[in-house]
Amino acid sequence: MSASTLTPPPAHLGRAKLILFLTIFVAMLGLSVLFPIFGPLSRQLGLSESQTGWFSTAYSLMQFVFSPIWGARSERIGRKPVLVMGLIGFSLSFGLFAIVADLGLRGVLSSTLLFGLLVGARFLGGILSSATLPTAQAMMADLTDRGNRAAAMGLIGAAFGLGVIFGPGLGGVLANFGLTVPVYFSAGLGLVTALLARLTLRETREPGTSAPAAGNRFALARGPIVVFLVISALFTLASVGMEQTISFYVQDNLHLTVAQTPQVVGGMLALFGLISAAVQGGAIRPLSKKLSPTMLIPAGLIVMGAGMFALSAASVFWTMAGSLALIGIGSAILGPSLSAALSLSVNEHQQGQVAGLNSSALALGRMTGPLIGTGLYQSVSHHAPYIFSGGVLVALLAVVALARPQVRTPAPG
């Protein structure tokens, strides 16, 4: 916190964090209801696994480009309007995607036009919704001092994790009424979240008080920050490669129908989210008081890598679910630890910028992970995406061991 942040009085600080937590949770719920249905929906539309990967790549490409822009903009005009705009953009893009998918299911659109419009909707969503994550992280940083930063990032991680717990299961239930129903639900939930943020969140950053804008928005990317950003990008690549192919993997290995797949995948991902949220909400807070982020990062890589290799060998429901639980534990340790390491490496005026850079790193992983994962699944083998992801995590562990990145407290600015 600094003089330029608009910190609520102590009596309202807890409420402000709770409202921000709920905002992130509801937004993530709206996104995660789609996880179980993307595979079955794509196959019903006549699209290949590789084409399905382009939906996430288009979305994340725009997030990669625009996340730093929105992060810096939140420094100049305030966090709240940028966050609300991102949530509205999320809603509009999902509504458009659902309408186009419905037209495709009815045979109204040619396959080429259908694919182009679906990818276009994802491009639009990536541009607008990329404002949400960096702004939410920066708002939480505004509300906490440096000593509590890791715990605060764990709270954000718990909000994401809880969204992942309830979202996939809810998506599986909603898919009983039609494969596009979860997409419409996400669009409506995005509008509700935007309204919640608009009416209840207080501004945490005084507009116009940011540090002078740098000519190069990547000027912060130096020293240990580069290492943390590389880990963010590649661990996300590994994770998203799994997420993008898991519905295909479950359907093909367990020999499920299109109707059965969303329910089974939803249950598995709900377990994944439950474990992740339990670690982020319960274990990260006490661990972060005793261990630095740079000590927790290798632990997360080891656990998540073990889960990926186990998943590549899994062939029945419970071994798949157990492997996903391991991946969830590793991800729950890595995510908030990386966010905390980055946040603690810059001064208070640079929180929005570094959050934007981290969102770009995450988006870079989300941009490449789906294409690699679906490409390996379609062209090499059903197990290849998870072996590849495990190898990436082992390589990152070697990088950490060699580079030994440390959080360096910056000079006040």
Residue ranges and their predicted role:
Residues 66-78, 278-293:
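Helix-to-loop junctions at the C-terminal end of transmembrane segments
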